[in-house]
């Protein structure tokens, strides 16, 4: 059994160690803001697209070529008749890029040195865009729904390039097609304190006769939050 004196010495040693640890914490400098990127314009926040959910607010479409023009004509006819078109999202598959840029759900933009991250409520999609040149060269044989994105800053504008997008995705809910040669260029800038602007240029030499550009705006929603999105809980569509 330990003696009272020995127990007191043990307690005093623990107290001394605790005081020393607290002193060490006090001497540790406070960390800076978690998402600070002082070198660039702050684009961070929770945003919601405005101007409707067509790819272009004025409902214009790229000048389509050959089979892509015929495919869109067929889909447009079905759409105008209220018939469900062949859309991957009907089976809870991702909308893909650039359709993701116009879905009616909010996204959070997180900006850190060397990286910008887009957290979408829709389908719980995450886009990680390196801006420090650290991205490995994309493999053209590995196409995905949202492609490979890499970015850089031009003054107060974030420029994001995306390629290697699956060719069975569509530009918007009306079914505008594209090929595997699609290249998406986004130019994000803060128009004012509550508005984010994204000028989008699509280049696709197989499907479009010329590049197509449109501008989308997003409204800041500081009191909103990203909600859970589970498509599989309500996987129903008229065509099913």
At which residue positions do the language-model features occur?
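Bacterial N-terminal signal peptides
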Residues: 13-22
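Bacterial N-terminal signal peptides that target proteins for export
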Residues: 2-14
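PEST-like low-complexity, intrinsically disordered acidic/proline/serine-rich tracts
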Residues: 2, 25-240
């Amino acid at each position: 059994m330990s003696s009272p004196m020995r127990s007191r010495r043990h307690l005093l040693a623990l107290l001394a160690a605790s005081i020393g640890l607290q002193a060490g914490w006090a001497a540790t400098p406070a960390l800076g803001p978690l998402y600070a990127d002082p070198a660039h314009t702050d684009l961070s926040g929770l945003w919601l697209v405005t101007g409707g959910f067509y790819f272009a607010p004025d409902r214009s479409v790229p000048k389509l070529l050959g089979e892509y023009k015929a495919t869109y004509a067929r889909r447009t006819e079905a759409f105008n008749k209220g018939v469900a078109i062949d859309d991957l999202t009907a089976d809870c598959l991702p909308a893909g890029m650039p359709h993701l840029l116009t879905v009616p759900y909010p996204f959070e933009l997180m900006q850190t040195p060397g990286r910008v991250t887009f957290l979408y409520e829709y389908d719980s999609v995450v886009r990680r865009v390196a801006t420090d040149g650290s991205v490995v060269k994309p493999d053209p044989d590995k196409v995905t729904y949202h492609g490979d994105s890499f970015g850089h800053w031009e003054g107060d504008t974030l420029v994001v390039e995306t390629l290697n997008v699956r060719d069975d995705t569509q530009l918007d809910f009306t079914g505008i097609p594209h090929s595997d040669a699609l290249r998406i260029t986004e130019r994000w800038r803060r128009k004012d304190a509550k508005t984010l602007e994204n000028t989008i240029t699509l280049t696709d030499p197989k499907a479009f006769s010329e590049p197509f550009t449109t501008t989308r705006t997003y409204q800041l929603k500081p009191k909103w939050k990203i909600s859970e999105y589970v498509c599989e809980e309500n996987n129903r569509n008229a065509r099913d």
